Swiss-Prot record:
It comes from Pseudomonas putida (strain ATCC 47054 / DSM 6125 / CFBP 8728 / NCIMB 11950 / KT2440). The keyword Metal-binding does not apply. The lineage of its organism: Bacteria, Pseudomonadati, Pseudomonadota, Gammaproteobacteria, Pseudomonadales. Belongs to the bacterial ribosomal protein bL20 family. It comes from the Bacteria. This is Large ribosomal subunit protein bL20. GO terms for cellular component: ribonucleoprotein complex; ribosome. Binds directly to 23S ribosomal RNA and is necessary for the in vitro assembly process of the 50S ribosomal subunit. It is not involved in the protein synthesizing functions of that subunit. GO terms for biological process: ribosomal large subunit assembly; translation. The gene is rplT. The keyword Hydrolase does not apply. Keywords: Ribonucleoprotein, Ribosomal protein, RNA-binding, rRNA-binding. One of its GO terms (molecular function) is structural constituent of ribosome. Pfam families: Ribosomal_L20.
Length: 118
């Protein structure tokens, strides 16, 4: 059986990692050993943050809805309770957008929630 030298395979593997590490600072983009660690860590951060992004956006939407609700004389929790009682099914993303960009429409929704709560 012929002896197999791994030069081609090793070069391909190294090129793949260094391509993924392109744009990293210093040795992280040039030295294979360091680049491999950086790419693995970047993958871990990306995996974690894809999940955190959902939580962070929900928190942002809630903060915006709360600010909009309080300008209309209602707290966030009371607004959500009022919307549930009035069977108005608008998700937080849309509510937050209305609170920021369409203040009149948001105020109308808050008034409906207030009417049900009173």
């Amino acid at each position: 059986m012929a002896r197999v030298k791994r030069g081609v395979i090793a070069r391909k593997r190294h090129k793949k990692i260094l391509k993924l590490a392109k744009g990293y600072y210093g040795a992280r983009s040039r030295v294979f050993r360091v680049a491999k660690q950086a790419v693995i860590k970047a993958g871990q951060y990306a995996y974690r943050d894809r999940r955190q992004k959902k939580r962070q956006f929900r928190a942002l939407w809630i903060a915006r809805i709360n600010a909009g609700a309080r300008t209309n004389g209602l707290s966030y929790s009371r607004l959500i309770a009022g919307l549930k009682k009035a069977s108005i099914e608008i998700d937080r993303k849309v509510l937050a957008d209305l609170a920021v960009n369409e203040k009149a429409a948001f105020a109308a929704i808050v008034e409906k929630a207030k009417a049900v709560l009173a």
